[in-house]
C-alpha cells in the first residue's frame, strides 16, 4: 500500500457537525511507572492532540499532578486501583499499554490484568516495555482482540526471535504469522514499515533527528488516537496514516531544527490534520 493523498483522506476526514466527544472514541493508556513518568505523559499528549474523544491514563499516583500540569484534558487514576482499572478497561475502545511501564512486578500485573479482561472488539496497542514482557509469554495464549504491536528492532528481536540482521520483509511476515490473524505490526527503524498479514507498507519519511527519548511514546499515542477517532476506517490504514503523519511532521520541523522533540510533533498534529482533511 502506498501513502498518498487519497489514502490520507480516506482516514483523516472532516468532522460531522452533530458529533460529540463520544463519537471519537475512548482510550485507556497504561504506563508511566517510576522513574518513567514522562513517557505516558507524552503518549497522552499525542493521543489527545490526535483527536481521541476521551483519554484516561492509568499511572503512578505521584505522576498524576505532572500529567495534569501538562494535559488537563486527560483523566487519570492510580494504576493500582484494581476496580477502577477494570471499569476503565471495559469502557475503552482502545487500550495502549507500555509507555514507561517498566518491567517490575506491578508492570507485569498490569499487563496480565489487561490481557485477562480485554474483549474481542477492543484494540490493544502494545508498546515499549510491555513488548518485552509480552515476549516472555506464550503468544498462542494471547486474547482475541485487535492487536497492534509497535516495536523497534531490538524489541521485535525479543518478540519474534529474529536477530536485527534477519529482519527482512519475508522473515518478518513469517514471524507475524505466530500472532493472531489480523495483528498489525509497526516495525520501527530508519526504514519504518507497517505490516498486516501479506500486506506491507514502507514509509519514506523520518530521519535521525527523531532519535530522542519519547519519540516512540508519541507515535504510540498517535496510533491509539487514530484507532479511537477513526473507528469506522480500516485499522491498517489508520495505523499507516498515523505513523506516516508522525514522521512527516518531524521532517517539516527538522527543516529548521537539528533535533525534533516529540512534544513539538504533538503540538503540530491538529493543524496538520485540519490541512489534510480539506
UniProtKB/Swiss-Prot annotation:
Keywords: ATP-binding, Lyase, NAD, NADP, Nucleotide-binding. The keyword ATP-binding applies. (6S)-NADPHX binds at residues 39, 102, 152, 217. Its cofactor is Mg(2+). It comes from the Bacteria. Pfam families: Carb_kinase (PF01256). InterPro entries: Carbohydrate_kinase_pred_CS, CARKD, Ribokinase-like. GO terms for biological process: metabolite repair; nicotinamide nucleotide metabolic process. AMP binds at residue 216. CDD domains: YXKO-related. NCBIfam families: yjeF_cterm. Catalyzes the dehydration of the S-form of NAD(P)HX at the expense of ADP, which is converted to AMP. Together with NAD(P)HX epimerase, which catalyzes the epimerization of the S- and R-forms, the enzyme allows the repair of both epimers of NAD(P)HX, a damaged form of NAD(P)H that is a result of enzymatic or heat-dependent hydration. PANTHER family: ATP-DEPENDENT (S)-NAD(P)H-HYDRATE DEHYDRATASE (PTHR12592:SF0), ATP-DEPENDENT (S)-NAD(P)H-HYDRATE DEHYDRATASE FAMILY MEMBER (PTHR12592). Homotetramer. This is ADP-dependent (S)-NAD(P)H-hydrate dehydratase. It comes from Streptococcus thermophilus. The lineage of its organism: Bacteria, Bacillati, Bacillota, Bacilli, Lactobacillales.
